[in-house]
């Protein structure tokens, strides 16, 4: 049997009708030399049945428990046969040429180890959901360009990390880095992996032409206590694990100021309890991460200056949620035009 070029992995948990729509979009792809694995985290709504009913051949793995996004993806990746791993959320609906554009990007930028997609808001297609993950030196990560007009989607560029709602990684690199950190459970594990990839000398490219329509926390809730807790606990862990001491310690007062600002913000949104629990568990959990931090920093293959150039320093970019892509070094080809209209999957 000839192995597929890529493996698309979808983690499902009570996604309702979204999984069926997600699979229908994959079935309509212009390039079909990929396999699909759906791993279900013990859904109670029967949504996993869509994997068996779909016209798209899909392998269904019943996890038997809610493993979380990170561990479920790792388990499915261990079953993958493709040289590329493509992670896709069940609330992300791929444009018909999405896989084709991802693999074209891999051919165009053979030095890159990971690729991100242009994420368009599925509920408001005039707006972006994200164009590459940004990591600020104050320990804040966000989807670049979130909420901005879709016409402002950037051309191809080097991103700090791709958003794993719709991203592609070299399987050998993913495995060598140990995959997603399963202690994160959900949220921020893609930024953590991207940070580790960056420290290991890897590079990630955001592809303008690879488009998906993403609901964005459509299953867990954008401002739910679950999202607030895991997102903030995990940003503390990702920063501590990966940020070199020369940057981490001098900027500690600024991270504390960010913590206070976010406390006020989440209090106004009615999520103070979830946020305070995230701070408590985040900082109390740092002791257990010391060995991992030492191993990551000991194995760092890039210089401090190179890392500093990849990080975002401007507070205004965070406040405006601007994308922060770098020109792709050595790219001699014409880049994709991100403003070209793509119909929303029905």
Label each PLM-derived region with a short phrase.
Residues 85:
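Short aromatic/hydrophobic "clamp" motif used to bind/position activated sugar donors
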Residues 102, 160-211:
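A short, conserved alpha-helix in the catalytic core of glycosyltransferases
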Residues 34-42, 61-63:
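Short beta-strand/loop segment that forms part of the nucleotide-sugar
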Residues 200, 204-309:
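Active-site-adjacent helix/loop segment of glycosyltransferases
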Residues 128, 137-141, 148-172, 186, ...:
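A recurrent flexible, glycine/aromatic-enriched loop bordering the glycosyltransferase active site
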Residues 62-80, 90:
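Glycine-rich, basic loop-to-helix element that forms the pyrophosphate-binding segment
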Residues 24-33:
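Short, acidic, metal-binding catalytic loop of nucleotide-sugar glycosyltransferases
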Residues 92-140:
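Conserved donor NDP-sugar-binding/catalytic core segment of glycosyltransferases
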């Amino acid at each position: 049997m000839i192995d597929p070029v890529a493996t698309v992995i979808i983690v499902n948990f009570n996604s309702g009708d979204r999984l069926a729509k997600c699979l229908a979009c994959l079935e309509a792809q212009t390039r079909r030399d990929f396999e699909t694995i759906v791993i279900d985290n013990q859904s109670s709504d029967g949504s996993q049945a869509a994997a068996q009913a779909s016209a798209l051949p899909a392998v269904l793995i019943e996890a038997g428990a809610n493993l979380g996004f990170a561990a479920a993806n790792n388990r499915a990746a261990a079953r993958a046969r493709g040289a590329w791993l493509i992670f896709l959320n069940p609330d992300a609906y791929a444009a018909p040429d999405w896989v084709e554009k991802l693999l074209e990007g891999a051919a165009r930028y053979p030095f890159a180890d990971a690729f991100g997609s242009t994420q368009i808001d599925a509920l408001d297609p005039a707006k972006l959901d994200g164009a590459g993950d940004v990591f600020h030196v104050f320990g804040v990560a966000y989807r670049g360009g979130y909420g901005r007009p879709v016409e402002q989607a950037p051309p191809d560029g080097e991103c700090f990390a791709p958003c794993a709602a719709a991203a592609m990684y070299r399987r050998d690199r993913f495995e060598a880095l140990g995959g997603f950190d399963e202690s994160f459970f959900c949220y921020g594990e893609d930024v953590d992996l991207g940070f580790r990839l960056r420290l290991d000398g890897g590079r990630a490219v955001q592809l303008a032409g690879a488009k998906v329509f993403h609901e964005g926390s459509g299953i867990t809730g954008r401002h739910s206590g679950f999202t607030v807790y895991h997102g903030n606990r995990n940003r503390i862990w990702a920063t501590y694990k990966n940020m070199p001491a020369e940057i981490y310690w001098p900027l500690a007062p600024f991270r504390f100021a960010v913590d206070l600002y976010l406390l006020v913000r989440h209090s106004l949104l009615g999520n103070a309890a979830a946020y305070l629990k995230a701070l408590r568990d985040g900082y109390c959990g740092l002791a257990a991460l010391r060995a991992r931090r030492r191993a990551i920093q000991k194995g760092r293959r890039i210089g401090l200056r190179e890392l500093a150039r990849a990080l975002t320093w401007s507070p205004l970019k965070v406040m405006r949620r601007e994308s922060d892509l770098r020109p792709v070094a050595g790219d001699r080809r014409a880049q994709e035009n991100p403003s070209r209209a793509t119909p929303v999957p029905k």
